[in-house]
């Protein structure tokens, strides 16, 4: 039995598919560039760290605009606010050292992960959301580990930077899985 997605779901799935491919590509490029400068906290590494949640803001804005026909974008607005706060927090923490950056990054990963998990659960019927649900849950765990790593003897940015790579993989898988939903109508 073949089911056909409602026009709103199909349109949203196509928009999310494009967004998820773009997010995967950005995350991989960002991780590669940021790994190259993550051995110490400099103006460049801080700027790169601030850029990541700002891209999350832009993606959430695009997501909210494309998702209006399939449900309330309230959680996406929460994600926008949280990611903006994270960007500001990272800019400030950059002058305080790696432990402060890891605490802000960790707190952001926990809250953004919870939002991603809940958004994924609410979009389950659209298809392609299991990677987002899993990724959201893993973000909560990763964020907790970043927060804990801030208290280590020699905390490093590389684990926080590495956080982008599994995220990119999950976005890529979700984009591929959303292809079926986008084509059903």
Q: Language-model segments: which ranges?
A:
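Membrane-proximal helix-loop-helix units in multi-pass membrane proteins
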Residues: 85-134
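Structural signal for membrane-spanning alpha-helices in multi-pass inner-membrane proteins
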Residues: 31-34, 60-63, 90, 116, ...
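Membrane-water interface at the C-terminal end of transmembrane alpha helices
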Residues: 118-127, 146-152, 167-184
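Hydrophobic alpha-helical transmembrane segments in multi-pass integral membrane proteins
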Residues: 31, 86-96, 139-156
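Core segments of transmembrane alpha-helices
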Residues: 23-30, 79-87, 135-140
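Structural signature of hydrophobic alpha-helical transmembrane segments
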Residues: 40-54, 95-110, 161-166
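Alpha-helical membrane segments in multi-pass integral membrane proteins
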Residues: 104-115, 129-146, 160-170
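N-terminal topogenic module of multi-pass integral membrane proteins
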Residues: 1-70, 179-185
């Amino acid at each position: 039995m073949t089911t056909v997605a409602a026009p709103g779901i199909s349109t949203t799935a196509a928009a999310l598919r494009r967004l998820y491919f773009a997010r995967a590509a950005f995350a991989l490029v960002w991780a590669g560039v940021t790994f190259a400068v993550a051995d110490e906290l400099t103006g460049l590494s801080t700027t790169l760290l601030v850029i990541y949640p700002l891209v999350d803001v832009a993606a959430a804005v695009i997501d909210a605009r494309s998702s209006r026909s399939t449900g309330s974008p309230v959680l996406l607005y929460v994600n926008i606010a949280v990611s903006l706060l994270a960007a500001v927090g990272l800019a400030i923490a950059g002058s305080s050292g790696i432990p402060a950056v890891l605490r802000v990054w960790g707190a952001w990963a926990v809250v953004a992960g919870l939002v991603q998990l809940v958004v994924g659960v609410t979009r389950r019927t659209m298809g392609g959301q299991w990677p987002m649900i899993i990724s959201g849950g893993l973000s909560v765990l990763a964020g907790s580990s970043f927060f804990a790593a801030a208290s280590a003897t020699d905390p490093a940015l590389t684990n926080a930077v590495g956080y982008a790579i599994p995220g990119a993989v999950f976005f890529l898988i979700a984009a591929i899985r959303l292809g079926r939903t986008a084509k059903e109508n």
